[in-house]
Amino acid sequence: MKRYIALDIGDVRIGVARSDIMGIIASPLETINRKKVKSVKRIAEICKENDTNLVVVGIPKSLDGEEKRQAEKVREYIEKLKKEIENLEIIEVDERFSTVIADNILKELNKNGAIEKRKVVDKVAASIILQTYLDMKK
């Protein structure tokens, strides 16, 4: 079985998560700063390191289910990934509330202020997106 990678794609950062080898549990992996790193190449490296071409991508939607303007940017980024990564399989998932849930989890865990939230919220959001997908496919 192959691992899945998930992406929470933003203008500044991309949260990355991966599944366990059985495709049951999602875990935060890293946050890519798009201004400091060639993000498409880094994601290609992550796919290679994890021997996968299965990438779950969160698509931003409004509360009523309509796609937000950001969804168009995410799809443009997906096209860049497809050009870089051979045989890439993209699975789109509604990402409504993933960042809000991640933010709430981190607030609860960070009562002593040890976690710098903005550095981890995106990868936690990516893990929520991936876990949502893994749970749906059971």
From Swiss-Prot:
Transmembrane segments: none annotated. It is an enzyme of class 3 (hydrolase). The keyword Glycoprotein does not apply. GO terms for cellular component: cytoplasm. Keywords: Cytoplasm, Hydrolase, Nuclease, Ribosome biogenesis. Its main location: cytoplasm. One of its GO terms (molecular function) is nuclease activity. One of its GO terms (biological process) is rRNA 5'-end processing. Its EC number is 3.1.-.-. The keyword Transcription does not apply. It is found in: Cytoplasm. Could be a nuclease involved in processing of the 5'-end of pre-16S rRNA. This is Putative pre-16S rRNA nuclease. It comes from Fusobacterium nucleatum subsp. nucleatum (strain ATCC 25586 / DSM 15643 / BCRC 10681 / CIP 101130 / JCM 8532 / KCTC 2640 / LMG 13131 / VPI 4355). The lineage of its organism: Bacteria, Fusobacteriati, Fusobacteriota, Fusobacteriia, Fusobacteriales.
